[in-house]
Every structure is written in structure tokens, then in C-alpha cells.
Design a protein with these regions (language model features):
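Hydrophobic residues in well-ordered beta-strands that form the structural core
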Residues: 261, 282, 340-342, 414, ...
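PLP-dependent aminotransferase class I/II
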Residues: 366-445, 451-453
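Short beta-strand-to-loop capping motifs
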Residues: 387, 463-467, 503-505
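Conserved core of the PLP fold type I
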Residues: 187-336, 348-363, 367
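N-terminal basic, amphipathic alpha-helical segments
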Residues: 1-186, 396, 400-406, 429, ...
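Conserved PLP cofactor-binding pocket of PLP-dependent enzymes
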Residues: 479-500
Length: 521
């Protein structure tokens, strides 16, 4: 809210608009005309929350006053008052004849009460909106980007009223909470007598450095089903697959190293590797795998240390690596002396016989990473890596320096789910349900005028919309729909008409109606 010292004498309320409802939807929030706050205060709070959650990034331009008034069904004076408050809070800046822009985080500090402004907010608003009524205005509105961080934050700020088409997780109602509760009780029961209700002491101390022994044995059996020859001694657990990927990167790489990545590929991995100081070498990814000629040329020119890839049910395309391509990738890795980090996050949704590089290579030059967030629960941060014997101690050391150990209670509960066959049966049910959802989503997408760039498979569809999906993502975000625009899946963030959809969360006709409306705008 605006500081008292900078507030106008009377709060400005929007005049009645006959056609407007009593409550105005604004994404995940609602503007209520009868609320204690003015509409301007509610609208300012809406944008302030988006900025602080990094759904609107530094440099992003806010909608024009007229566009925001139309979008939120309020008067222009209400929008002016809301932007005035954002200026006073130091969240945005007004640029003469250009509009309002999110300020850089380093300078985004709330104004102290009574602080002196170089330019009064009202005057800054006037200067910023002067061009809106000028016939010379021709520059298009630059949409605030949706990036990897925004997608992650979207997981924690999703609109409860809408499914999130851009997220990479299953809907909560698809998960089996009863199975998880039973597994936890099963783990704790042997340590308790009928009169003992205390938590066993073994769960109050650090766990084993490499991870719970029981889980590592269960994982070794699971990997054997995929043809990956890993002993329990070759497996190290982590706080989720993302943590496992980070451990491997820190253990094998140093800042400045070159890393081959799929293009398109997982946006979070690009951001993480860049943050660690690595040089990304994008390899075009097709239906059957990477462009082998491009990989060969990049390897010759840059001597990469690592290739990070998702062989099965690739994110974002849903495609899986062909057997012939897999053998050629391994040949190039041997020829150019780089290791391969295989991310098998979606293993539970894929056929066991799908070609995996780690199975073909026998864990000699490859490292396998997976987890359980996608199939059990995102909050159960249990992941693991399986590596060649000569790398295991190095990876354990990196884990110890970063997090010490991982929670034994959750690891043993996951082991129970594996040992009892509960996880396999649950995964079979999810795969069947996902197949039906995929069929419905594909029909809706095609009816909305989209086409699939790769054959639909697994959790994700790689959809060509025919228009700039970054603009689509911006427009639909205010309607409460979080999209995953194609640009975030390219290391260079190039413009894209593609978007990733989650088949489990795109069966709602309301989304496709909103999509068609935004695309035609």
C-alpha cells in the first residue's frame, strides 16, 4: 500500500460501472467492490504480488492504463491510482512517453514514510501516460516474460480456481495420499511398542551419507528392470532429482566448462548450469534424439565435459530417444571424451523397455538421475543418482558439503512403496488415467487450431500455436492460466510459436476458450 505521507487526501474509488459484476476476477485474486480496500489498492496489491513472486521480472512493462482498465473491468482512474501506489512503493518506474516498468531488484525498496521523491508519483503517472492519448504512439506493448524462475514460482502461486497448463506436475487429486500415509506407518511401526508413541531415535539423527541402505537396495532392483546395472554402492540419494542433477554438475564441472544441452530442453537446467558458470552448447533435439552432426561439430570445437539430456519422455517435447540415435550418442561421447548425465525424471510414466543411454552404456561413461516428485508427491523430495564406481565418493562429498544427509524417514517410506509393489500399481493407474487425459487434451488442442510438433506422449505436449507464445503467456497469466511458452525451453530464449502443455491439466474447455480468445487478440 502507498505510504500515508504520499497518499492523496481521499482514497479514490472507481465510479460505478453498470455492466460490471460485484466482484472482478484478476487472475488468482478478486477485486471486490465492497471490500475494505479500494479497487485501486486491490489492483496495486495484485501487481505487487506478481512482481515480488517474480512473475513480472525487472524491465517488464505493465499494461497501459487503458489496457489494464479493460482487462480488469475498472475505470482508467482506478488504474492510474493503482500505478501511483506501485510508484510510491518503489516497485515500478515511470518512463516518459513509454509507460510503467518493473524496477530492478537492486533498487526495488519501499519508500519510507515522508521520504522525498525526485518526482511526485502523480506527475510521473502523468508523464508516463501522456503518450497513450497521442496519435504518435506506435510502439507495441512489450509483454513481461515468463521464464524458468516464473514457472517454478508458479508452482507455489498457482490459481486454485484453474489448473496450470504450464506446470510439470500431476494434479494433487491424481496422487495417492493414502499409500504414502500407510508407508510412513509401516516404517515407524516396528520401532514402537503399543505403549510407545514417540518418534524412533533413528529418525532424530543424521542419516547415512550415501542415503538409506534399504532404499538404495530397492533402487538397484528398480534400475535392473530398466537394464541399468547399478549396485546399491553405486547409488547416492538426494533431495529430489533437481538436487541430484546439481550434485553431479558440481562434482564433475568447474566454472567455464562447456556443457552440451538439448535444444529445446528443460529451462530450469539451463538456468542452473548458467548460474554455476558453465558454457551451454545447444544441440537441436528432434523426434528421435539430438542432431548428431551438430553434436559432433560442437564437440570438436568446444571439448565439452558433459552432455545433459532426457532420453525418455523428453521435456518439453515428450519424445523418446531412438535406439540408433542412442548408439551414435554413445559413440560421440567416447570419441570426444565427455560424460553423459541422463535425466529420467519421467521414468514412472514410461515403458521399462524404452532405450536408455545408461542401460546401453552400462554406467561406464553415463550417470543416471531420477526421483519421485512426479509420481508420488512434489513435496516428497526424494531423488537419486547412479554413477560409475570411480565417481561415487566424489558425489557423496558434494552432497555432504551441500546438505549433509537426506531424510531417512521419507527414504524408507519410498523404499516400502517400491518393495511392496505399491508404487508400480499406482504408476500403472496414473499412466492409464494420463492416456485418457492425453486423448481429450489432444482433441481440444487440435480443435483450437494447434498442431503437435512431436507425436503426443507421456505428460507433455509440444504444441505449435502459430503465434508468439510469450505474448500468449503474458495475456493468459492475468486470466489465471500459467503457460509454459516455447522461448523458455531454448537456451538463447529465442521467440517461439510453441508451448508445452501438461496433458493432465489441459482438459478444461475454459482454458482453450481463453487460449483462443488471447490468440485472436
Amino acid at each position: 500500500m502507498q505510504d500515508d505521507a504520499l497518499s492523496p487526501p481521499r482514497a479514490r474509488r472507481a465510479p460505478p460501472v453498470p455492466a460490471a459484476p460485484a466482484a472482478v476476477a484478476v487472475g488468482a485474486a478478486v477485486l471486490a467492490r465492497s471490500a475494505a480496500q479500494t479497487l485501486a489498492e486491490q489492483l496495486a496489491g495484485h501487481y505487487a504480488a506478481r512482481i515480488r513472486q517474480r512473475l513480472l521480472l525487472p524491465g517488464a512493462r505493465l499494461p497501459s492504463v487503458r489496457e489494464s482498465a479493460r482487462r480488469h473491468r475498472v475505470s482508467p482512474s482506478t488504474v492510474v491510482a493503482a500505478y501511483d501506489q506501485l510508484l510510491a512503493q518503489g516497485l515500478v518506474e515511470a518512463k516518459r512517453q513509454r509507460g510503467f516498468f518493473v524496477r530492478d531488484g537492486d533498487t526495488m525498496t519501499p519508500r519510507a514514510a515522508g521520504a522525498t521523491l525526485a518526482e511526485p508519483p502523480d506527475l510521473a503517472v502523468h508523464r508516463a501516460i501522456t503518450t497513450e492519448t497521442s496519435p504518435r504512439q506506435s510502439a507495441p506493448l512489450r509483454p513481461p516474460p515468463v521464464d524458468a524462475t516464473a514457472l517454478i514460482r508458479g508452482m507455489f502461486a498457482a490459481d486454485a480456481q484453474h489448473p496450470a497448463p504450464g506446470l510439470g506436475t500431476l494434479p494433487p487429486e491424481w496422487l495417492d495420499a493414502a499409500m504414502l500415509q500407510t508407508a510412513l506407518r509401516r516404517v515407524m511401526a516396528p520401532a514402537r511398542s503399543a505403549s510407545d508413541t514417540h518418534l524412533p531415535s533413528s529418525y532424530l539423527s543424521y542419516g547415512e551419507p550415501a542415503g538409506d541402505t534399504r532404499l538404495r537396495h530397492a533402487l538397484a532392483q528398480r534400475l535392473a528392470d530398466f537394464g541399468v546395472p547399478a549396485t546399491p554402492a553405486q547409488i547416492v540419494t538426494a533431495n529430489g532429482a533437481t538436487h541430484a542433477l546439481d550434485i553431479v554438475s558440481r562434482g564433475l564441472l568447474t566454472p567455464g566448462d562447456a556443457v552440451l544441452v538439448d535444444d529445446p530442453g528443460w529451462s530450469v537446467e539451463f538456468a542452473r548450469l548458467t548460474q554455476l558458470g558453465m558454457r551451454l552448447l545447444p544441440v537441436p533435439r528432434g523426434v528421435d534424439g539430438p542432431d548428431l552432426a551438430a553434436m559432433d561439430a560442437l564437440a570438436k570445437a568446444h571439448q565439452p565435459r558433459l552432455y545433459v539430456t532426457c532420453s525418455v519422455l523428453h521435456n518439453p517435447t515428450g519424445a523418446s530417444l531412438g535406439l540408433a540415435s542412442a548408439h551414435q550418442v554413445l559413440r560421440l561421447a567416447e570419441q570426444h571424451d565427455f560424460r553423459i548425465l541422463e535425466d529420467d525424471t519421467y521414468a514412472h510414466l514410461a515403458p521399462a523397455h524404452a532405450p536408455r543411454l545408461c542401460a546401453l552404456d552400462g554406467l561406464r561413461r553415463t550417470i543416471y538421475v531420477s526421483g519421485f516428485a512426479k509420481i508420488l508427491a512434489p513435496g516428497w523430495r526424494v531423488g537419486f543418482m547412479a554413477a560409475p564406481p570411480d565417481l561415487v565418493e566424489r558425489l557423496v562429498d558434494v552432497k555432504l558439503l551441500g546438505t549433509l544427509t537426506t531424510p531417512a524417514l521419507l527414504e524408507q517410506a519410498v523404499a516400502v512403496c517400491l518393495e511392496q509393489g505399491w508404487l508400480r500399481r499406482h504408476a500403472d493407474r496414473v499412466v492409464a488415467r494420463l492416456g485418457a487425459a492425453r486423448t481429450r487434451s489432444v482433441k481440444l488442442a487440435l480443435a483450437a487450431g494447434c498442431r503437435f510438433a512431436t507425436p503426443p506422449a507421456g505428460l507433455f505436449g509440444w504444441v505449435d500455436t502459430g503465434v508468439d507464445t510469450e505474448r500468449l503467456a503474458t495475456d493468459l497469466l492475468d486470466e489465471g492460466w500459467l503457460l509454459a511458452p516455447g522461448t523458455v525451453f531454448h537456451p538463447g530464449r529465442r521467440p517461439s510459436t510453441l508451448m508445452r502443455i501438461n496433458f493432465a491439466t489441459t482438459q478444461d474447455p475454459r482454458f482453450w476458450r481463453a487460449f483462443e480468445k488471447a490468440r485472436g487478440a
